[in-house]
Amino acid sequence: MSNETKSMGKIAALCKRRGFIFQSSEIYSGIGGFWDYGPLGVELKRNVKDAWWRDMVTGHDDTSVPPGAPSTFDMVGLESTIIMHPQIWKASGHYDLFYDLFVDCKTCKARFRADQIESSDCPRKPSKRPGEHDECDLTDPREFNLMFKTYVGALIDPTAEAYLRPETAQGMFVNFKNVLSTSRIKVPFGIAQVGKSFRNEITPRNFTFRSREFEQMEMEFFCAPESSEAWYAYWRDRRVDWYVSLGLKSDNLRLREHGPNERAHYSCGTADIEYAFPFLSEGEFGELEGVSHRGDFDLRSHMEGKLIRDGDELVVERDEHGQPRHPGSGKDLSYFDDATQTKYVPHVIEPAGGVGRTALALLCEAYDEDAIPDEKGVPQERIVLRLHPRIAPIKAAVFPLVKKDGQPEIAAEIYRGLKKRWHVFYDQKGSIGKRYRRQDESGTPFCITVDHQTIEDETITLRDRDTTEQTRVKIADLESVLAARLQM
């Protein structure tokens, strides 16, 4: 089933029906741009984050050179706070530059992002076809800062203003020296972080794709300036391979390099890893992850103050008195390289992806419809999520065929044994066919059924989700067989 023929409405309905994703505050009519992840959704997200953390941090071998990498490198983790010193956002440029342009329609009272007006529906048009705004009285574009403002302490006062972080990256930059001095590591090295970020999007849309509260998986990789281009190429290619390893088809992925006019003012190079989401038109892709070569912009900003581009150089922005408009910390964030006896400000390569977008892409990729015969041999349509076993919320389901003859007791014992290692589900209610269908829709790779033959020869039926093929496996061999098939 191709992405072009998949219905985003059906995928969203499945997510609600099977407990992947719920509208936040739904009993109060919901709140736009916020989503709750249900029992299966939270497991899917956790598996995505665990896979990322394992591949980026705990599974990294710092004693050998990975394929395609310029050299060995170290990798550590960090968890920084959601609310940080407000000066961080001024020095980084977010306070002045982190905004979208929006327009209001005086006719229909709707609000649109200025760069999405051609793809937005007009509420007053019966057809609601995107871009039909010829009769609308639109305002001139205005700036809208995307950071959520709050206050620290008991006083609502300008001096107490703070912001919910719009990205996790700045926490890693301001902790650069702390990590360097406490972790016995040297450049090149990376700092990885998974955490919540917040952006007050003007028009959140397309299910969970554009949300106001979301989780990011970001890594800041610090390297010497002369090797930064090679590291940028390495991380750009490696991150594409990671998505393929989780089950996204290469045909549905695209690596798009930004042109010079599209890049941020600090960027030395940026590439987006994009996915062909079903809610987009054929041939269109939506961003999954950005990989940016940020140069020395971030560490210099937090040393010197907010930087602006002056020709080919980044210089500190000055006020009318010649002082930094938004001062940095004044701390020395440069690095002394013992091997070369040189001092420099490290360059940064940043792969930054979204947990929610990754989960959404995996759900879209996995969604399929086919027909399989029921107990009487009559073809029945089914919905199945062909999730990669590594990120499937439930790894296996255990069923007794009937609720008698000792089958529930044997099934429960198998369930308890497997649960020590994996997330396993037990179900003894309803017909076996309906139990299979529920697990197919939940993305469970394997179902284990205890039946009459189990009593005789201590074997069970192991059913494959994708092929529906069933094989007999000895109970004593079940854990090793399942581990091999799950690749875990």
Regions found by a protein language model. Give the residues of each.
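NTP/phosphate- and nucleic-acid-binding module
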Residues: 1-488
